[in-house]
């Protein structure tokens, strides 16, 4: 899906600034305005631009929270609908921005201990409770956020971005792997 592809791009962007620069250059070139069969539709181009804005916002927020050792748990819905997870939190339906993400996870904020769920390029809900992995072979050094990210990725096709409060490390869980 388009969201999954863009979230994979998040990983590359977060961990490799040189690749980010190259991708931004390609995105600005006129070549990106065409696809194999001709022009992209205006709606497709607008959606791609919106997804790119979301990716950039998540990257900036993740980097800022990492620098400040602020823990975060962000779930990006794919094909599996996460209705039960969303209903465990507070529905907010907010535009994605680094400031909004930072406010959600700011220590002491009402929703900071749960996960934020992203759907269709928006923050759908926050303060959501995720299932913990039942796997006992996971390192004892991993905290609850990481165990929840793995548990969520075992039960759905969601991509989960975790920022460690302890180390500031940014991790991604997908298909049961961190």
Question: How should these model regions be labeled?
Answer:
Residues 10, 15-178:
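Divalent-cation
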């Amino acid at each position: 899906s388009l969201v999954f592809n863009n979230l994979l791009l998040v990983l590359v962007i977060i961990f490799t600034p040189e690749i980010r620069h190259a991708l931004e250059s390609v995105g600005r070139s006129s070549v990106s305005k065409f696809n194999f069969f001709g022009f992209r539709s205006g709606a497709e181009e607008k959606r791609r631009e919106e997804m790119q804005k979301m990716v950039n916002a998540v990257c900036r927020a993740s980097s800022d929270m990492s620098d400040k050792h602020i823990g975060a748990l962000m779930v990006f819905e794919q094909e599996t609908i996460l209705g039960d997870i969303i209903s465990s939190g507070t529905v907010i339906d907010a535009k994605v921005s680094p400031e909004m993400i930072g406010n959600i996870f700011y220590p002491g904020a009402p929703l900071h201990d749960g996960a934020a769920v992203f759907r269709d390029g928006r923050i759908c809900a926050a303060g959501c409770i995720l299932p913990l992995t039942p796997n006992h072979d996971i390192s004892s050094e991993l905290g609850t956020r990481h165990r929840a990210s793995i548990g969520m990725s075992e039960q759905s096709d969601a991509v989960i971005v975790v920022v460690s409060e302890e180390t500031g490390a940014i991790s991604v869980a997908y298909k049961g792997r961190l």
